[in-house]
């Protein structure tokens, strides 16, 4: 995911001050949050483990961070806790520097990683991955009142801001070929070009965009425009819990819990808690 942790950390502090621990209003029923876990996907569940030792990092808001009380929280962390609640087992969440998370599992100091560790062929030599519990969509953001539905026709000849060399730039080039790409080197530069009118729209990840829209810099200038884009070939297949490659029993229990948490709206409710508005 490409977004500025500094931008989100600053905006998250403001949002938490304004709204308290639950940073969004509404409910799963009206959030538009999609079902992420197809019924029957993943590994079949066996007997639940007696407990789960999760590890995470503390420097990736709003997914895992230290709150104002000095406690670890965030979307990833609360998903981990919800898994244990669903399985009716105790769990712990320990903090490690991100580069040491894999070692914690390999050395049997932890059972599972809840930190958005990438699912790559190299890491699959050591890790197995749960079904996805979160996908960050891509979204268009435009200035008020120019919030017309984005389409190849409506954006023909328009300037669309993207992060240079990103998957978002690739997507616009492939599906909106008549749009003019305006590359930026950072999210701050990208959103500044939108607010100033240098570009007609930006296309980027919904997480960073949602925090910018809710923060003090945007000052209500802009809003999401159109729907969410989730094509896995461009935007990945989502965040997953990672366990030891040979721990199929634990993977099965986690997959089962995530299927249930998706079906009953818990994942959507947690997304509403940690993001300023629906990402979809």
Enumerate the predicted regions with their spans.
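Membrane-interface motif at the C-terminal end of an N-terminal transmembrane signal
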Residues: 21-24
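Bacterial N-terminal signal peptides that target proteins for export
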Residues: 1-11
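Bacterial N-terminal signal peptides
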Residues: 9-19
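Proline/Glycine/Serine-rich low-complexity intrinsically disordered segments
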Residues: 15, 26-280
């Amino acid at each position: 995911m490409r977004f500025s942790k500094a931008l989100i950390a600053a905006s998250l502090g403001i949002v938490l001050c304004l709204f308290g621990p639950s940073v969004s209003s509404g409910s799963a029923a009206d959030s538009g949050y999609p079902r992420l876990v197809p019924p029957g996907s993943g590994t079949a569940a066996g007997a639940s483990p007696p407990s789960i030792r999760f590890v995470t990092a503390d420097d990736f808001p709003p997914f895992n961070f230290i709150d104002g009380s000095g406690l670890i929280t965030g979307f990833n962390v609360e998903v981990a806790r919800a898994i244990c609640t669903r399985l009716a087992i105790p769990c712990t969440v320990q903090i490690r520097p991100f580069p040491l998370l894999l070692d914690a599992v390999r050395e049997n100091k932890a059972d599972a990683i809840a930190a958005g560790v990438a699912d790559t062929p190299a890491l699959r030599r050591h890790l197995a991955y749960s079904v996805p519990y979160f996908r960050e969509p891509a979204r268009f953001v435009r200035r008020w009142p120019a919030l017309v539905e984005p389409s190849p026709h409506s954006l023909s000849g328009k300037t669309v801001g993207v992060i240079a060399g990103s998957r978002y730039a690739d997507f616009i080039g492939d599906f909106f070929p008549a749009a003019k790409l305006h590359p930026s080197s950072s999210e701050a530069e990208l959103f500044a070009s939108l607010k100033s009118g240098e570009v007609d729209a930006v296309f980027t990840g919904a997480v960073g965009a949602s925090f910018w829209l809710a923060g003090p810099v945007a000052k209500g200038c802009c809003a999401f425009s159109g729907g969410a884009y989730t094509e896995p070939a461009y935007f990945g297949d989502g965040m997953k819990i990672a366990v030891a490659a040979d721990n199929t029993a634990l993977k099965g229990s986690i997959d089962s819990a995530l299927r249930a948490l998706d079906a009953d709206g818990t994942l959507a409710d947690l997304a509403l808690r940690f993001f300023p508005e629906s990402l979809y």
